[in-house]
Structure formats: C-alpha cells, structure tokens
Amino acid sequence: MSRSLKKGPFVAYHLLKKINKMNADGKKDVITTWSRSSTILPNMIGFTIAVYNGKQHVPVFISDQLVGHKLGEFVSTRTFKSHIKADKKTKR
C-alpha cells in the first residue's frame, strides 16, 4: 500500500538535517543511521549512508536509480546459511 501524496515521503528528521548540512558544506562523509524506513530523496545522491542491519552498519552508495526506495531495501537483515546435505560417502 503506497503512502498518500499529500503526506509526502517519510524521511527521519535527523537524517534529513545531516544531509542538508553536508550539502551546504560540500562534504561527502559516511552517514550512519538506524532509520531503515527513510525514503531516499534526490538530495541524497552521491552520499554513502551506512544502514544498520541489526548487527553492523552496511554502507550503501546512493545513486539516482535508488531514489524513491527505502534505505532498508538494500541491506538484508537475515543471513542465509545453506542447508548442508549429508555426504553420501560417510553414510556407507
């Protein structure tokens, strides 16, 4: 279900404030955030945002193709450990 157009996209205030300050200063430092639900806006292009996956911060470089998506879409929270099949030689 999409968000109402009159409300606009959700971006955490602290993240938006950091982006606007760094745009004004001309810096491109890595920004750490826990806000996986924030929408990527056009003024975030060119930044590297380290998004928390529950264990560590994973860096995501923001390009123009990512605009409109959520930050959490690009950082998986679950690691898949494959199901190890029993070796047939050891069964004999």
UniProtKB/Swiss-Prot annotation:
GO terms for molecular function: rRNA binding; structural constituent of ribosome. The keyword rRNA-binding applies. Belongs to the universal ribosomal protein uS19 family. The lineage of its organism: Eukaryota, Sar, Stramenopiles, Ochrophyta, Bacillariophyta. InterPro entries: Ribosomal_uS19 (IPR002222), Ribosomal_uS19_bac-type (IPR005732), Ribosomal_uS19_CS (IPR020934), Ribosomal_uS19_SF (IPR023575). Its main location: plastid. Keywords: Chloroplast, Plastid, Ribonucleoprotein, Ribosomal protein, RNA-binding, rRNA-binding. This is Small ribosomal subunit protein uS19c. It comes from Thalassiosira pseudonana. Protein S19 forms a complex with S13 that binds strongly to the 16S ribosomal RNA. It is found in: Plastid, Chloroplast.
